[in-house]
Amino acid sequence: GLVGSEMCIRDRYRLKFEELFYVQLNILRYAKDRQRRYRGYIFEKVGDVFNTFYTKKLPFQLTGAQKRVLKEIRNDVGSGRQMNRLLQGDVGSGKTLVALMSMLLALDNGYQACMMAPTEILANQHCETIKELLFGMDIRVELLTGSIKGKRREAILTGLLTGDVKILIGTHAVIEDTVNFSSLGFVVIDEQHRFGVAQRARLWSKNIQPPHVLVMTATPIPRTLAMTLYGDLDVSVIDELPPGRKPIATVHQFDNRRESLYRSVRKQIEEGRQVYIVYPLIKESEKIDLKNLEEGYQHILEEFPECTVCKVHGKMKAAEKDEQMQLFISGKAQIMVATTVIEVGVNVPNASVMIIE
């Protein structure tokens, strides 16, 4: 009898293997087919813009990982096929810098570049960061979000058509029909899972040929899953932090240690740091979750009467949410109590602790 059951296990294993093998094979076939169908713009040269930035403007030495990823991107954009690459790296690993340098390659070859972020706050932050990095170089960078209207919007749209605007940064607003480029060659999409494939395709349709696409995410995605989810994307990983960045420590504590936890939070705030407190949506109903957040918020107000506490959750109106976020970003509020809506990424370099209830 034993032999029979062992055979059975092996047969099942074989069938499972075969099924997965064919899934992977199909994905690969799809990717190869895609590469044949979509020709990309060829960026032949590394020119003045890139070189000036590299020699004069780099805020710090690139890490080995950043150099490796840049090389992968340069190979892609010089190959004649359209690049579709997923760039994954922890918060603080320097993805934005790699994205910016890739965009400069497009500029060197006579194309425009565009960066799309999931929220206005994030788009604003990217725009400020990039303008700061390019300060003193003659490159017109513009921000386009839903709240930019009227004459200002018209001026940006005209600038895109004439080719004066070299880099456009924005939210979903950049894929509206009214937005047209003179020659869009490179697109960066931040936090992929907020944008569907259809939305990526809408950016391509703004051109005769599809631009090169770089997708950035801080969410670690296992390679096999990446293939299945984004079968059309090649994956690059930035797996080292810039010098001087401390790795992030994750600690699990039980409820009875709350007092000592709050003590260490106080210490951080006294040192001028800021703190996130996150109530993830675990319960089934949003009502209960909101109640948890509200109770947590009241509790934190009582615990930290000396602090300004702001709160953010998914049920708020966008304007209200932005106002609360601004309090935290500007440093006026020391503590932010939030649901997981903040996961899309806000850059608050001064925040040093995140407590997840």
Please give the residue ranges for each predicted region.
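Ordered, soluble secondary-structure elements with a strong preference for glycine-centered loop motifs
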Residues: D11, G64, K287-K291
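Generic amphipathic alpha-helical segments used as scaffolds and interaction surfaces in large
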Residues: R10-K16, K57-F60, A117, I121, ...
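Upstream accessory/linker segments immediately N-terminal to the RecA-like ATPase cores of bacterial MutS
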Residues: S5-E6, R10-K57
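Glycine-rich phosphate/oxyanion-binding loops and their immediately adjacent helices
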Residues: G1-G4, I9, G64-V69, N75-G78, ...
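Charged catalytic carboxylate motif
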Residues: E19, A65, S260
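Amphipathic alpha-helical interaction segments
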Residues: L15, E19-Y22, R68, E72, ...
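Conserved pre-motif I regulatory segment
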Residues: Y41-L86
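Inter-lobe coupling/hinge segments of SF2-like helicase ATPases
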Residues: Q82-E357
